[in-house]
Amino acid sequence: MVLDFFNNLKIVINFIQYMKNYKIKNKFFKYTMNLIGNKGLGKSFLGESVKKYLVKHCKTNDIIVNGYKMFLDEKDVMHFSLFDYEPIETEIVKTNVKKNDIVVDVGANIGYYTLLMAKNHASVFSYEPEPQNFDLLKKNVILNNFSSNVKLYNKAVSNFNGYSKLVLSDHSTGQHKLEKNRFGTKSIDVEVTKLELDKIDFAKIDVEGAELLVLQGMKTLPNKMLI
């Protein structure tokens, strides 16, 4: 067991040295992140230290996630790169979203599921309230040439129209939370809307526990959902 640890340590050190001497490209960045995970180091102190080093010193402008080029927030780089991203949920979307479907992505974040839906030639309505996430969402849609069948909204979705506080998470860009009356925490004012589409074939809803409020505000419930 001790020998295995030092063998793993040697492998990681060799890759770090390589990265110090050469300009990092996407495939080397992703390969190294995968190596850490496959060697069982992902959650160890050593693994976390190496991942932090890679993110700080070996950034790429974009990486490939499940076939899509994506600009990522710094907090998301490790999460998207280390393993296949949410394989079960990904397969659900691939299986259930069909050509010409009307689909919504509520809590789109930076657009992984929006891109997945758009690839199937569906009409996608994508909602993301946090400005930095929305900026990356927009860039990722443009980067993958999906502007023609994706409509983007810099709004939160709930059971009312108006404005609310979006409480910002320090840990992850995917954990921001909508709360009407919240003080003493970092938050921003965001526009809120109800979903009033006449037809929804598929909906992906990821809003940190407020999914029921989204459903309450829908004019028509979707035929299929991923929550």
Give the location of each predicted region.
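Beta-strand secondary-structure signal
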Residues: 62, 71, 163-165, 189, ...
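Short, glycine/acidic-enriched loop or turn micro-motifs at the edges of active sites
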Residues: 108-110, 131, 157-159, 207-209
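S-adenosyl-L-methionine
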Residues: 2-192, 196
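Conserved acidic-Pro-Pro-aromatic motif
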Residues: 60, 101-102, 114, 120-122, ...
